[in-house]
C-alpha cells in the first residue's frame, strides 16, 4: 500500500522497535497521526525525557532515575544476595514476582561466541568486584533458559565459586528457550524459591 512519505517513515521507525511488526506499526502510526497533537507531543516528550534523564546504576547497571538506583540504596533489601540478569527488563520481571528482596546485577547480554560476545563485552568484571568486597553470600544466576544463558550461567559459576560464594541457578519451570521477561510472576517466584546450585 502506498502511504505519504511522512506516514511511511513513521511506520518504518515504529516497526524497528522490538515486538512491533509491520501491521502493529501501521496501527500505531495511524493512531498517532489522527490523535490530538497534544497526545503525540506528550509521547514525544516522554521518550526524550527517558533518554535524557535515565542513567545506568554504577552498582548494578540497572536503568534508574538516580545513581545508585533505589534498589541498591534500599537498606530493607538483603545486600548479601545478588540476582544476576541479562537485561534491565529482567529486573522488572523478577520484581513483579514479589518473591525476591535482594539486589541485582545486570550483565547487559549473555555469552555468545558466534556473535562475538565474550566475557569482556559483558558487565562481569563489576560482578566479580562486588563479590570480592565480601558482603555477598549468594549469587542467583537468572539468565535466560537459552543456550547462551546456560553458557553464561556455567561461566559465572566457575568464575565465582573460588570466591567462597554460593552460586545458584533459577529452578526450571521456566520454559527452555524463552526470555525471563515473558514468565508470569507465579512461575518466576517458584523458580526463585526452588533455585539450585550451579
From Swiss-Prot:
PROSITE patterns: RECR (PS01300), TOPRIM (PS50880). The gene is recR. It comes from Desulforudis audaxviator (strain MP104C). Residues 80-175 form the Toprim domain. It holds the Pfam family Toprim_4. The keyword Zinc-finger applies. Transmembrane segments: none annotated. Belongs to the RecR family. InterPro entries: DNA_Rcmb_RecR, Hlx-hairpin-Hlx_DNA-bd_motif, Rcmb_RecR, Rcmb_RecR_Znf, TOPRIM_dom, TOPRIM_RecR. This is Recombination protein RecR. Keywords: DNA damage, DNA recombination, DNA repair, Metal-binding, Zinc, Zinc-finger.
